[in-house]
Amino acid sequence: MPKGPFLPSEFVPTKFSTAADKADFGNAFLHFIESGWKETLFTKTFYNRLSNTFGHIAHYNRPTFYSTWFTSDADRLRFLEQALEWPCWGDAEFTFCDVERALQREIRKRNYVVRYELKAAEAVRSAEMAILERLEAKYRPTPTQCAEERVDPVTSATGSSATVLEVASPVQGSLF
């Protein structure tokens, strides 16, 4: 029984890889995504094959490749988008282009891009809300501070009110 949707009969063997190797890679790729991109599944063998698919030829080592593409939802989204945009060059007798096309179909079918768009947007929202909370804690007065400002004992005892300064808009002079 196969460990994923791909069977060796769906792929053409190359000089250096069997059809079973291609099916195993495709299934490992999908398992890697479904696992939540677990680093333990990003083995040297898997990295060596993945780094030669979907145009990923400029990465020099496994840790750099992993940190570039799989450490945040935004990075994972970029990875999936690149995989879908890749034109799958080559002949299946010499490359993994048949596996790339099959993976593109499966990525679309499983709706990974939309899922990671939502996850990436939520990560941005969470980060922005944390910043907002920090800024509000620093700059927004608390209800007790607001109450103290309304009934200031110094101004209420003297009967005078504080001077209010108006903020003027800056005027740009000529630079020449």
Where are these regions (language model features)?
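Short amphipathic alpha-helical segments that mediate assembly, nucleic-acid/protein binding
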Residues: K22-G26, D73-L77, R125-E128
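Short, charge-rich amphipathic alpha-helical segments embedded
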Residues: P143-A147
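Charge-rich, low-complexity alpha-helical coiled-coil segments
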Residues: L103-T142
